[in-house]
Amino acid sequence: MQSLLLLATLLGSALGGAIPSQSANYNGYKVMRVSGDDTSKISHIVSKLGLETWKFPKAANANVDIVVPPKKVAEFEKMSHAAGLKKQVMHENLGDSIKSEMSFRPYSCELLTLDGGANDTWFQSYHKYEDHLKFMQDFQSAHSQNSEIVTSGKSHEGRDITGVHVWGSGEKGSKPAVVFHGTVHAREWITTMTVEYILAQLFDDKEAGAALLEKFDFYIFPIANPDGFVFTTESDRMWRKNREQNEGGCYGTDLNRNWPYKWEGDGSTTDPCSETYRGPSPGFAPETKASTSFIKGLADGAGVKMFVDWHSYSQLFMTPYGYSCSARAPNDDVLQEMASSFADAVKAVHGTSFTTGPICNTIYQANGNSVDWIVDEIKGETAFAAELRDTGMYGFVLPPEQIIPSGEETWAGVKAMFSKLK
C-alpha cells in the first residue's frame, strides 16, 4: 500500500510546475505502460530517474503510464528489465504524436449547418482557444431564442470562463440546472470537444434534446481552465493545472483539488510543484472562486439537478466521494444506477467499456474536488466525475479521429443517464 501512495505522490511531480514560459519539447520522449506484481519496484524507478507518470495503479499488476525523456530511456530499460516489469510502448516519440494531434483545422462559421447545428467538420480536429470562443458565439447566435453566452468569472490571467446556457420553453433559468465542466485539467483536450458535442446534440438530436431542454436548463463550460488550455496549445501540451505562480518558482494549482470542501487530506499535496497541488487555501484559485460562485447562484435559484466534471483518460464514470473511500452519498443507489446506465449505453455504440463506482475506490483519493462539493455543500441532487477515452495506447494525446466516436458514445450515455433521473 505504501508503494501505491508513493506513486500517487510522484504523479507528475517531475514536470508538474517548473516550466514558466518556454515551450516544452517532447521530441524523443517515450511513453511506456508498465505493470508488475510489486509496485514498489515501479515507484523506485520513477523516483530514482525523476520520471513523470500519467497514471498510477489502484492495485498490483495494474498499469502505470510513464513518460521517459530520451536521455533516460537506456537506464529505464535497464532498470525495468532487472525488475521484471511488463512493458508496452504507448508513444514511441511523444513529440511526433503531439505534432499530429496539433493539426488544427481553421475555424469558419461554415462549420455550422444551415439550421445552426454543428457540422461534423468541427469535430474532426482539435482547435485553438480563440476558435472555441468563436464556435460558442456562433452556435449561440444560431439559437438566440433559447441560449446565451455566460461567464462564471475570470481566470488568473484575466480570460473569461465562457460557457453556453441553453433552455427550452419558458423563461431562462426557470428549470433545475445541469452543469457540465470540461478541460478543468488543461491537457485533457478530448473533454473540450466532447462537451461541445453534447452542446450541439441538445439541438441536433431533435427529439431527445428537446425533451431534456423542456425539463432542465443546461450550463455548458467546455473550457473551465482557459489559461491552462491556452498554455497547452502554445507552450506545453502536457500541462495540467492553472497558471498561477507559486512560491519557489513553480506554477499552477490543480483546480480539482482546490474546491472548498474536504480540502486537506491524502488525495492532494502541499507541494507547489506537484500536479496535484491543492493551492495555499480552499477555494483560493480565481477559477475555483468563479465556479463556486456561479454554481451557488444556480443552487439558490431553481437548484442544481446534475453536475458532471468531464476528464480523461481511463474510461470511468464515477460517483461521490473522492475524499473518502468509505463514505457514500445519501442517494448512492440512484447514482450507481445512473452511472451503470451511462456505461451500458456507451458500450452499445462503439463497444467502449466504462468502469463505474465511487471516485476514491475507482481511480484514487481526491480531496477538494468539485463533485464532493456539489453534493455536500450546495446539495446538488446528482454529481459525477467522468474519465473519457481511452484505455488503449494514446492516453492524453488522443488522435482527433476519436473525437466523433467519443462524442457519439458519450451523448448516448448522457441520454441513458437522464432516463434514470427521477
UniProtKB/Swiss-Prot annotation:
Q: Which one of the record's GO molecular function terms can you name?
A: zinc ion binding
Q: Which GO terms describe its biological process?
A: proteolysis
Q: Which PROSITE patterns match?
A: CARBOXYPEPT_ZN_1, PEPTIDASE_M14
**What EC numbers are recorded for this enzyme?**
3.4.17.-
Q: Where does the chain bind substrate?
A: 185-188, 240, 256-257, 312-313
Q: Where does the signal peptide begin and end?
A: 1-16
Subcellular locations according to the entry:
Secreted
Q: Name the propeptide positions.
A: 17-119
Q: Which cysteines are joined by disulfide bonds?
A: 250-273
Domain of life per record: Eukaryota
Q: Which residues bind Zn(2+)?
A: 185, 188, 311
What does the note under cofactor report?
Binds 1 zinc ion per subunit.
What the protein does? Extracellular metalloprotease that contributes to pathogenicity.
Family stated for the protein in its record: Belongs to the peptidase M14 family.
Name it: Metallocarboxypeptidase A-like protein TRV_02598
Instruction: Give the classification, highest ranks.
Output: Eukaryota, Fungi, Dikarya, Ascomycota, Pezizomycotina
